[in-house]
Design a protein with these regions (language model features):
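Transmembrane helix boundary and interhelical junction motifs in multipass membrane proteins
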Residues: 21, 31-45, 110, 116-128
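Conformational gate/switch positions in structured elements
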Residues: 41, 69, 109, 134-136
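Structural signal for alpha-helical transmembrane segments and their flanking helix-loop junctions
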Residues: 44-49, 118-144, 156, 161
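Membrane-interfacial helix-loop-helix
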Residues: 1-26, 49-118, 144-194
Length: 194
């Protein structure tokens, strides 16, 4: 756990760097289409380091996450057989993807909204939206709502309770790391066996 605590402390320091917002933009964009690390990892320490800019950071996450989601949609729509399938295979979701199609045709908008808000791998949904031909305009609108809710909720909580949350994270870092890991593995497990 010392390794993870060191990463957390390092991230808090980098969050104060003058170029931190560009890293946040890049991670937000990439995570929505192919990158495995969510932008929350950088958003949280950045908002803790500069409470006054928390809502601005949420805006960055929302905009670039939706733009990355459009790339994910394009990968699914235009390049699923040449690129998208490898991303799905990387996460071992081949079987789930075909079963998922039936649910997606009926509940696509709700699925995009849910994935936008939760820790569910959003890139899986952005690619699926393209593969299954979800209306691109609805996809963008629902992505803005879902991703905006997620990132602004985090930013608002950190704005109002930042120091308390930071103390809580510092005190229970090891437990929170384990819980986060269990949730991450659990969500991948659920996706795989839907």
């Amino acid at each position: 756990m010392n390794f993870l605590r060191n990463i957390y402390n390092w991230t808090l320091k980098k969050a104060e760097h003058k170029n931190a917002k560009w890293y946040l933009s890049l991670i937000s964009f990439a995570e929505s289409s192919f990158f495995p690390i969510p932008p929350d990892i950088l958003l949280i320490p950045m908002a803790l380091a500069s409470k006054a800019r928390a809502l601005f950071y949420a805006l960055i996450c929302t905009i670039f996450s939706v733009l990355g989601g459009i790339l994910g949609y394009a990968i699914g729509y235009f390049f699923y057989n040449s690129v998208g399938i490898y991303i799905v295979e990387f996460y071992h979701l081949e079987n789930s993807f075909s079963v998922f199609e039936n649910y997606y045709k009926e509940f696509g908008i709700l699925i995009v909204l849910g994935a936008g808000i939760t820790p569910f791998p959003y890139k899986f949904i952005t690619i699926a939206s393209g593969v299954f031909g979800l209306n691109i305009f609805l996809f963008i609108i629902v992505s803005i709502i879902g991703r905006g809710l997620r990132f602004y909720l985090i930013a608002i909580l950190l704005y109002f309770f930042g120091e308390k949350i930071k103390l809580f994270i510092d005190k229970y870092f090891n437990i929170l790391t384990i819980v986060f890991f269990i949730l991450l593995v659990g969500s991948v497990f659920i996706i795989r066996f839907i």
